[in-house]
Amino acid sequence: MDLARSDIIPHLLCLFQEIIQANIQKVSEAYDLELKIMNILTLWRNGSDNLISDNDDYMKKGLFFSRSNDPLALQARYARMYDDLFKLNNYEVPDDVVRRHDNKILDIILKESSVPFWYDISDDEAHESMLPEFRLQDIHEFRLNLKRVRVVPDESEEIQMDESQSDKRRRKKRMEKSRPVWLSGSESDRRIELNDSLKPSQKFETKLSSYLLNRLMNEMNPHYCGHPLPALFVTLIMLKAYSIKNKFFSYGIRYMELVCNEIAGPDLNTRTFPVLFGSDGSFVGTRVYSHYPIKLRMILNDLTYLLTYSDLHKFQEFELDVNDEVLLHMLRTPNDGRQLKKAVTRLNHYYGLKFNPKTTDCGVVNGMDFTHKHPITKTADFTSPVLPMTNSFNKAEICYGHNSKILNRAVFTDTVRGHIREDLKNVADLDLPKLYEHVSKLVDMRVNYTIIYDLMFLRVMLNLGGYSRSNQITDFRKTIDEITKMNEGFLSGADPEKNIDTLNAWMAPTMEDCGYRLTKSILFGKFRKAKYPSDLEAKSNIDYYVTARSAGIGNLRISIETDKRKYKVRTTSKSAFVNAMGSGILDVNPVSNEPMMLTDYLLTQTPETRANLEAAIDSGSKSDSELMRILGQNSIGSRSTTAWRPVRPIYINVLQAHLAQAFIIGPHINATVNQHEYQPTSLWFTGDDLGVGFATLYQSGTADIIVPAIEASSTGKALSVLADCSSWDQTYLTATMIPYYNGIKRALLEYQQADMRNFYMIDSGRTGVPGMKLSEIVDWFNSFQTKRIFNASYLKERHSFVVKYMWSGRLDTFFMNSVQNALITRRIAEEVSLRVSNTGLSWFQVAGDDAIMVYDGSSISTTEQVTRINEITVRNYEESNHIINPQKTVISHISGEYAKIYYYAGMHFRDPSIQLHESEKDSGASDVTESLREFGQVIYEYNKRAIGTLRVNALYGRLIAGLAYSVNCPQYDASKRTYANMKYYPPPTSVIAPAAFKGGLGLSFTGLSLNEVLFIKLHLHEAVSQGLHVISMISFEANEVVSNSLSAYYLKDQKDLLRDMKLGKHLEKVKGISFKSSDLAFSGSDFSQGLNLKRESIDKVKLEVSRKSIRDLRSSGISVPSTHAYENLPYASLHQSFKSLKVDRDTSKFTNERLLVSLLEYKSDIPRVSVTSQYPVYDLINISKVDELNVRSGGPVRFISAPIEGKLLEENIGTRQGVQFKNRGYGGSQEVLHFIRSNGLVITEQALIDLIIKSGVLLMINPQRGLIDLFQSLSGDTASSMHLANFFMAEKPHWEDNAISLTIAGSLLENCDSRIENVKNFVSVLATGMQKDLQRMFYYVGFVYYAQRLIWSGGHSSKIFVSIDEDKLADFLRGSKPITRRRKAMAGTKREPINLSANFSYEISEPDREISEYDPLILCHPLSMPFFGNWQEKYSVMQSDEQM
């Protein structure tokens, strides 16, 4: 598509504006315009060589493009696209606006041309945390290279199928000789010295050029899912369409234009920005200047934030000027992001604290809104401890006036005043006057949403850099070495007041007592979901123990050769690793070596042995993993974060140590996860009582977790104290953890008889010992954790660190951090009560290293009291060896931040840290469909907190995903015996097509939820149904081939089981398998060893229980699938483990490539497919009437970091209050999850519910007995089976709540009052006689549709009338469950139609029992399954891998 046409830009702008202005009556027309835009942009992106021209065919088939290998053609196409981008930016913008900042931009470009060449970078600069700026090539040489590209003929040569090896070598030499060199000055290259703790010399040398280029490729890579140029174009044109009179102008794009002008010279065909990406977003490299990639990233991020957070600036001149000033500053100094962030750190903490007459007057002063309007919870009381079993918001009102002026003045201490002055000076020193003016607005108290908007606008700009990447070794050494020195001083007792003996004098006994008492409580069954398993149970559940909670393992590389091809799998799947290791994973001997530095180890060897080892290391014959095993060292990984933060170390725990912890402290973690089973009796954790402090007891994924703090801030009558400790893990000394483990051991020895006869692990270094009991595992782990050495590796540089503190990869990291934090908090509260006017702690919570304390503020009146609380808090953390910044220890009655949850005056908001385009690392997806479904999930999460227009943002996400959704298809030319590459774009409706269709991405149309089946059915079906036939053909099945083929290979002796598994056609004969791993525990294993371990773990008693239950069920005509039977658990577990394997992307091919290529010649009509064909329940539902509603809740808006439509939903429906479905449903599903996990099953929660219904056990004369038998057949465990059966019978309503919560949870409706009594104000279900629980399901279907309509109606509320096709429903219910022989006998052969207006039931002989047609619905009906709407469909994984 030629955008040079004078009418195309206004045409596109017009199309966008029509979509933005459309309402619910114009939804289908708006979607047609969207598809037209997608077509135009796809043609623009790929050129005019589309092989499908007819629009109807495009909707049905998609688009095909031939892909040229000619570098000149590719260069010309990208030059045209960049030219179009620049034309769009300048479109109808006055010349003075375009050139306003040209002097600054040209100065930036001049600075880029004057930075040192790469070979002038010093060794110290090369090792800096941030990659130094440097030039790769002189501009004139770069232009000469561009000319050389134009004369290279070989890149476009056709590769003949019968090309000889000599021809290949000659062709390769020609290409290398003529290929341009993009790095000047190779003659000036030199070798630099890098550290290597695993070399005898402790160092090695490498070329400076290689080191810098490797850093550049690693640290500048944004890990996009598609090429950024189309994203830039789409973002810019949407900003133009959405801004005032299309006048938006980007000075970031202007910078790119002037750079292109500078480097290209007069040749327009070379006028491209010198950063190279592949079509799939892969980073290829940069030219001329090192930091072009980060500048491009910042420009795209800036445009994206301006579009998606548009309500923060509303395209006002001042806000856009602030943004431009910060962007140009960052383009000039791309490595100064940390400096900018540091300059405003304290303003970020102490915003809105200064109380003055402007605050009291409640007017608008100099454009700033001081109106007093925020939520207030008048019933909130903090004069006594708050001890909730569950947290939920109370009713809130709108507060219009101040009532706590004393605290207003008390919190604004002289210290706080000084912090703010210093930050304002820091910004002034950066010469950013517009930013200075903006941040100055953050000082005064403004008790309404506008101050949050201004704060968020600042934080958006701090996130322009995306994911921060730097030199990991430099970052780690800076933090770890300094902290290690501090720790050694603390352990040595050099400071008489701050030392380990003083700390352990009070902490060690308390730690031991807590460990002892909680172990005792677990052993005595106080916490039903926490227990110490037997050794057989532990081994059979091993897949659960190595779920995502374990920090990681080394990668496992598997090469699988079949009769058709060779597959490569590179995985970190812990389940796969355990199944490859077998019982070896339980042997502690290989990892029990005393950790030593290599230099120290060599000194212990004889001269001859030392010389041989040094030679083996230097030659590479001694592998790194073997060397680290000998030295007892572990690995350090890394984690990148946003807002310019340094890279964080992630310590990789060996699996033997992880399993040891799972056996001894895992039950403690389980006891403190999920809601309380008992009413807390005090604030504090003692072991007997869990208290209220553990965040995990209240975690629901919502702001409910800290309701007391948010409600306290609404009243202004309580003080929140927020402790900000840095590097907590590194300052949490092992010496203070060991007492807790000693307490566990003491309780085990006193109370656990099974400790005498259960052997959980083995130590092959000890002969004649059958295994290790739990108490012995505690001793081993205490010895193991006393001192460790971890080795960090980055670009072949390696550094070893001695660790005597909490390493972050441990299973107990979050739990033990929380335990110590809670103990310190208690000590602080006791001292505050003694020293600060008897001020009492009302509530607190800890989440690992985060702590929040809420004190009763009634006795606080002076700044001196607040200062004293700060001093007490800081000193207690410092005396516990933690690093706490007094300047970041915020004490406020109105604001706070805890665990990334922010609040101000009862309003809640989230940091804009989610990156839309960038990823921390490459996607683990093995095909484009899976990758873009993951991207769709990111878009969905991003848009929920983006303060802009949800409709615009959702459209933006769909266009970005649609332009990235392409597949390369080779087409064989028989006449030339060559392959021509083709690029295929599926039908454009694949973007919103639900994920149940193989090629559907399931992105949201309304922004409310994913896979919006009902909305599509009602409004978009005409368009979507055209492409579903072809969308269903899009399939990448290499993963399925691998998993099925491996299952057939290892289970070849289980022919009946294989038959029941129905592995299908995706099966190839395995001829050979080889394994490699970088993990220390791996020593050349095979999946058969894992299978043997699982077989040995089968309990004979459970086996007999399971078999008997299967026989009993069979006698009632009920068959249990053999794949779920307890005796086949080892095989099912191995099969599920194989499903977690994903082949490398280069071997994951598009299975239907030939079929889709044949679409080019496909002449007959492609059939339409109904969207409900994969979701038949939605065929039952109709919206019979929609009436206008002119009623709003009249309540406040609490959730500020939500799109405009999200706030409209909250205004109309009412803000979240009371126990919502998330809480009830979450608790219900945990019963099933506990059963699955405690028995080591591989069935998912959904599959278990489906099995219950389809088996027919609910229709037995005694359904409770049937349930017990069914659960026993799966687990062999009588106790847990009886408990789950009782739960099903007693807690019937919770199943509807659970299914409903998965519709509400995670969506914007989560911010609203979604209780059924409130929902009925907006939805009516026209089925008065229908069973109530079934009615409720349909109420929530209508509720979601109500919200979707409101989003597309500009906030106009409607009453939704839901009608059900009763005949279809009756057929659906009959077809959803089998008819057993016993039921046929009861009912007779003639079947009467179901009467939906009554609770029709069959009378049976058993007293007080009856079977209703709707009984299964009361428990858990398949109608619930499609409501898992916001859960993206994934490849099948272990249940334990799905749940974090």
From Swiss-Prot:
Catalytic activity: RNA(n) + a ribonucleoside 5'-triphosphate = RNA(n+1) + diphosphate
Location(s) in or outside the cell: Virion; Host cytoplasm
Domain of life of the source: Viruses
Region (Disordered): 156-182
EC number: 2.7.7.48
One example GO MF annotation: RNA-directed RNA polymerase activity
InterPro entries listed in its UniProt record: DNA/RNA_pol_sf, RNA-dir_pol_reovirus, RNA-dir_poll_phytoreovirus
Record keywords, A-Z: Host cytoplasm, Nucleotide-binding, Nucleotidyltransferase, RNA-directed RNA polymerase, Transferase, Viral RNA replication, Virion
Ranges where the RdRp catalytic domain occurs: 690-897
GO biological process: viral genome replication
Main location, first listed in the record: virion
GO cellular component labels: host cell cytoplasm; virion component
Family of the protein in this entry: Belongs to the reoviridae RNA-directed RNA polymerase family.
Function per UniProt: RNA-directed RNA polymerase that is involved in both transcription and genome replication. Together with the capping enzyme P5 and protein P7, forms an enzyme complex positioned near the channels situated at each of the five-fold vertices of the core.
Protein name (record): RNA-directed RNA polymerase P1
Native organism: Rice dwarf virus (isolate Fujian)
